[in-house]
Curated annotation (Swiss-Prot):
Residue ranges with Basic and acidic residues bias: 1-20, 172-194, 915-925, 940-958
Function recorded in the entry: May play a role in the molecular organization of synapses and neuronal cell signaling. Could be an adapter protein linking ion channel to the subsynaptic cytoskeleton. May induce enrichment of PSD-95/SAP90 at the plasma membrane.
Protein name as annotated: Disks large-associated protein 4
Residue segments, region Disordered: 1-30, 47-66, 157-206, 342-396, 527-751, 763-798, 915-992
Compositionally skewed regions (Gly residues) per UniProt: 162-171
Keywords (A to Z) from UniProt: Membrane, Methylation, Phosphoprotein
GO terms of molecular function: molecular adaptor activity
Modified-residue entries (Phosphoserine), positions: 206-207, 378, 381, 388, 405, 415, 421, 580-581, 609, 611, 665, 744, 973
Length: 992
């Protein structure tokens, strides 16, 4: 396909166009019947008179207007020096043009419109046909051989030449060409350079480049003409014409590729001018022969690739040469016009365009066409037009390994669907024609071929096993048998062939995948996707593909290496089950689970892409050892195929299990089998979010049984786990509240950490004080176990359960904490001789604490009891309790600050430490005195200094209180807003 290169317009010039006088000396105008409508008018009448030598083809192509040129590679390529290789003197072109009938060119202009519409999307890699563009001489020889084969094998084909009546009649075919030739040449020169530049820029040659030139030749035959007759209406000869043409091609293409040439080794006469070629067929036969040879070039070059990589398939193809011939005949002989053919061979995107003007069959089936079809989905398509030997060999191994069961199944639709996966198996987007087309045509005739090639789930573990060498011989035999049976059925199933879902073969992968899901494909397809995922069946790839048949093909092809094994190092989650041992572990698990589960399977449904992502990327959550024993159906999460929210659908690592799993893993599984897993196991997550409401009644019955101290103990436990220097109430309480189960267990052993916890609690007000140390804190008495939660935190439990029970527990905890502090301070006063100032502070703190407990705490207790009493007339709501509790918090914080100061004093051996404020007071008064000894000013300055210190103290206190109020308000609002899900989720979970 390179031949549409830069110098395409050059061959239109007179200097390069070969002469035709010596070739057509005996005829006046017959050789120039180029119009397809009258191409074969005298074919039978002058069989021997005007022999068209092989090189006559080339001149005719030059004299045709560009729209009717059907052999793209006859155009001189920039790679070739045409003047040296052109065997014809350049002078004769003028005479030929002068002799060309004007009416003929007029008919061309009328009857051969340029249809650019449908073909702009078909772009083929320019570098794909290295063997095709070798040299014009080689091409001419190739065309000669094909033409000789046509006319020697099918002499009866010429009789119907007169029947050609494409769009017009033969009436004035010869009358006004002289005046038009210059215009057509100018149009060609003007139009083709544009296409050439586009082709050069893109590096692809668009089908526009050739099909524009060839559209006329194809369309001129009208809708009734055969697929490849190129304007011939020869009803009687069309089937044999196809058969011979493509018998020639398919029969000999295996021989041509060994020497890397495009010549056909044609048994008929050598390339001398054949006397058997009727000259009047030149115009249209030239087109047809050129098309046939073009296809042959495609086939031979593609097969060259195949042959280089593996000889096994070549052998099987050689054995089934007869099948090739039958297939060529059968596959190309599409009854009716381009419409029916286009519906069969075109992808849905191209069908409209093809309905107007057919595209050459072989081009459609060539790897370049598939490349063009996959161009929009170029993610899957490999860039290189020619497959590397390794990839091609791998493909061969696939074919060999899977062909053993040829003929056992017959589901053409499935087999053709599988072709999408087949095409994705390897990055080679120029697959050899035998590899792609032969299986397709086999499946057309004997649909079992492809379905067997890619439909055997049991073959998967053996894909690259040692058995494939053992099976090669019988595989080739079976392949031959299948091909023969296909050939026998070729004629009978010609019409049926059109009904097969061939578009799936050329359709973009995503379309076929969607169609496969809709069709509910079964396990045979899964095996294909499994194969296509990654040739070496590593367990990870197997598990992935098992559940994600086609989409896994897509992604796996994009990411050529097989899926990475599970990332077990993601997070050391402790447990996923309801009995998770640590709140913090649950929190981390929930966070990661929620995020990842949202990524992979949102809404509990796993479409194939989601499940694919989960199998390839996010498996870290479930694979990180989180798979809960009660929920994970299969123990080894090492190769989890799917990540569901909490459980893993672990794929067994043993191949024997792979087969039964494959049944589950059909595309249906992507919608069905995977779906249950996310729905079963994410259910805890969904429950978590609504659990605060769901568990309300159960909570009342279960929670009161746990002592307050034990709950406070869990507070401290989880706070230890979190180890937050400042008790973020949003963090510690979600941790602390949820674990009635672990409370009784944890209460005893966790007392030692309580000291640090209490320290933090005490220093909550001014956490920044570095002097506070664990040693300075009171011993972990039983009442201290509950004191781990800082005064600000009790509002947070309300987040979990804001009812009378909860607030009563909080109140009792605070009461015990304050009482403990008071008792501790009483002991200290008795044991130590404290200064009056220190003693005053102790008495102040203890008195305020006792006052708070005796008045406000009692009032709040009454409110809680009213809330719990359904008969209470002014029954306070949970909101009321929360608000009152927030007010209590301010008082509790003040008292806590006082006790903090006392503990600082205790750590300092009850020695008062000058605070920075006092130092400021002392330092500030002296400066004003020396400045101005005015009478009143020193006093004023002292007053200012003291006032400034007082203001600073008050402002600091105000800021602190404001910050605390803001924190309490934040806590209060957080408990009532959706942000508090994290707070009550773990608790609700444990209660469940």
């Amino acid at each position: 396909m390179k031949g549409l290169g830069d110098s395409r317009p050059r061959h239109l010039s007179d200097s390069l166009d070969p002469p035709h006088e010596p070739l057509f000396a005996g005829t006046d105008r017959n050789p120039y019947l180029l119009s397809p409508t009258e191409a074969f008018a005298r074919e039978a009448r002058f069989p021997g008179q005007n022999t068209l030598p092989g090189d006559g083809l080339f001149p005719l192509n030059n004299q045709l207007p560009p729209p009717s040129s059907t052999f793209p590679r006859i155009h001189y390529n920039s790679h070739f020096e045409v003047p040296e290789e052109s065997p014809f003197p350049s002078h004769a072109q003028a005479t030929k043009i002068n002799r060309l009938p004007a009416n003929l060119l007029d008919q061309f202009e009328k009857q051969l419109p340029i249809h650019r519409d449908g073909f702009s999307t078909l772009q083929f890699p320019r570098g794909e046909a290295k063997a095709r563009g070798e040299s014009p001489g080689r091409i001419r020889h190739l065309v000669h051989s094909v033409q000789r084969l046509f006319f020697t094998k099918a002499p009866s084909l010429e009789g119907t030449a007169g029947k050609v009546g494409g769009n017009g009649s033969k009436k004035g075919g010869m009358e006004d060409g002289k005046g038009r030739r210059a215009k057509s040449k100018e149009r060609a020169k003007a139009g083709e350079p544009k296409r050439r530049s586009r082709s050069n820029i893109s590096g692809w040659w668009s089908s526009d480049d050739n099909l524009d030139g060839e559209a006329g030749a194809f369309r001129s035959s009208g809708p009734a003409s055969g697929l490849m007759t190129l304007g011939r209406q020869a009803e009687r000869s069309q089937p044999r014409y196809f058969m011979h043409a493509y018998n020639t091609i398919s029969g000999h293409m295996l021989k041509t590729t060994k020497n890397n040439t495009t010549e056909l080794t044609a048994p008929p006469p050598p390339p001398a001018p054949p006397a058997t070629c009727p000259s009047l067929g030149v115009g249209t036969d030239t087109n047809y022969v050129k098309r046939g040879s073009w296809s042959t070039l495609t086939l031979s070059h593609a097969h060259e690739v195949c042959q280089k990589t593996s000889a096994t398939l070549d052998k099987s193809l050689l054995k089934s040469k007869s099948c090739h011939q039958g297939l060529a005949y059968h596959y190309l002989q599409v009854p009716g016009g381009g419409g029916e053919w286009s519906t069969t061979l075109l992808s849905p995107r191209e069908t409209d365009a093809a309905a107007e003007g057919p595209i050459p069959c072989r081009r459609m089936r060539s790897g370049s066409y598939i490349k063009a079809m996959g161009d929009e989905d170029s993610d899957e398509s490999g860039g290189s037009p020619k497959p590397s030997p390794k990839t091609a060999a791998r493909r061969q191994s696939y074919l060999r390994a899977t062909q053993q069961s040829l003929g056992e199944q017959s589901n053409p639709r499935r087999s053709l669907d599988r072709l999408d996966s087949v095409d994705m198996l390897l990055p080679s987007k120029c697959p050899s024609w035998e590899e792609d087309y032969t299986p397709v045509s086999d499946s057309l005739n004997d649909s079992s071929c492809i379905s067997q090639i890619f439909g055997q789930a049991s073959l998967i573990p053996q894909l690259f096993g040692h058995e494939q060498q053992v099976r090669e011989a019988e595989l080739s035999d079976q392949y031959e048998a299948a091909c023969e049976s296909a050939c026998s059925e070729a004629e009978s199933t010609a019409a049926e062939t059109l009904d097969l879902p061939l578009p799936s073969y050329f359709r973009s992968r995503s379309h076929s995948y969607l169609r496969a899901i809709q069709a509910g494909c079964s396990q045979e397809e899964d095996s294909v996707s499994l194969q296509s995922l990654s040739p070496p069946p590593s367990t990870g790839s197997l598990s992935n593909s098992r559940t994600l048949p086609s989409s896994s093909c897509l992604v796996a092809y994009k990411k050529t290496p097989p899926p990475v094994p599970p990332r077990t190092t993601s997070k050391p989650f402790i447990s996923v089950t309801v009995q998770s041992s640590t709140e913090s572990a649950q929190d981390t698990y929930l966070d990661s689970q929620d995020h990842k589960s949202e990524v992979t399977s949102q809404s509990g449904l796993s479409n194939s892409s989601d499940s694919l992502d989960s199998s390839t990327r996010p498996p870290s959550v479930t694979r990180g050892g989180v798979a809960p024993a009660p929920e994970a159906p299969e123990p080894p999460p090492k190769h989890a195929a799917l990540k569901s929210e909490q459980g893993t659908l672990t794929s067994s690592e043993s191949h024997p299990e792979a087969a039964p799993k494959r049944k589950l893993s059909s595309i249906g599984i992507q919608v069905d089998c995977i779906q249950p897993v996310p729905k079963e196991e994410p259910s805890p997550a969904t429950k978590f979010q609504s659990i605060g409401v769901q568990v309300e009644d159960d909570w009342r019955s279960s929670v009161p049984s746990h002592s307050m101290s034990s709950r406070r103990d869990t507070d401290s436990d989880t706070q230890d786990a979190n180890d937050s220097s400042c008790k973020s109430s949003e963090r510690s309480l979600p941790d602390c509240t949820p674990h009635p189960n672990s409370i009784s267990i944890d209460a005893g052993p966790r007392q030692a950490p309580k000291i640090a916890q209490i320290k933090r609690n005490l220093s909550y007000g001014d956490n920044s004080d570095p002097a506070l140390e664990a040693s300075s804190l009171p011993p972990p008495d039983p009442w201290l176990e509950t004191s781990s939660s800082s005064p600000a935190e009790p509002a947070q439990p309300g987040a979990c359960r804001r009812d009378g029970y909860w607030f009563l527990k909080l109140l009792q905890a605070e009461t015990e904490r304050l009482e403990g502090w008071c008792c501790q301070m009483d002991k200290e006063t008795k044991e130590n001789n404290l200064s009056e100032e220190v003693l005053g502070k102790v008495l102040s703190a203890v008195g305020s604490a006792q006052l708070l407990m005796s008045q406000k705490f009692q009032q709040f207790r009454g409110l809680c009891e009213q809330n719990l009493n359904p008969d209470a007339n002014p029954r306070p709501t949970a909101q009321d309790l929360a608000g009152f509790w927030d007010l209590l918090q301010l008082s509790i914080e003040d008292i806590s600050m006082k006790f903090d100061e006392l503990y600082h004093l205790k750590a300092n051996s009850w020695q008062l430490v000058e605070t920075p404020e006092k130092r400021k007071e002392e330092k500030k008064p002296p400066p004003p005195v020396p400045k101005k000894p005015a009478k009143s000013k020193p006093a004023v300055s002292r007053d200012k200094a003291s006032d400034a210190s007082d203001k600073q103290r008050q402002e600091a206190r105000k800021r602190l209180l404001a910050a605390k109020r803001a924190a309490s308000v934040r806590q209060n609002s957080a408990t009532e807003s959706a942000d508090s899900i994290e707070i009550y989720v773990p608790e609700a979970q444990t209660r469940l």
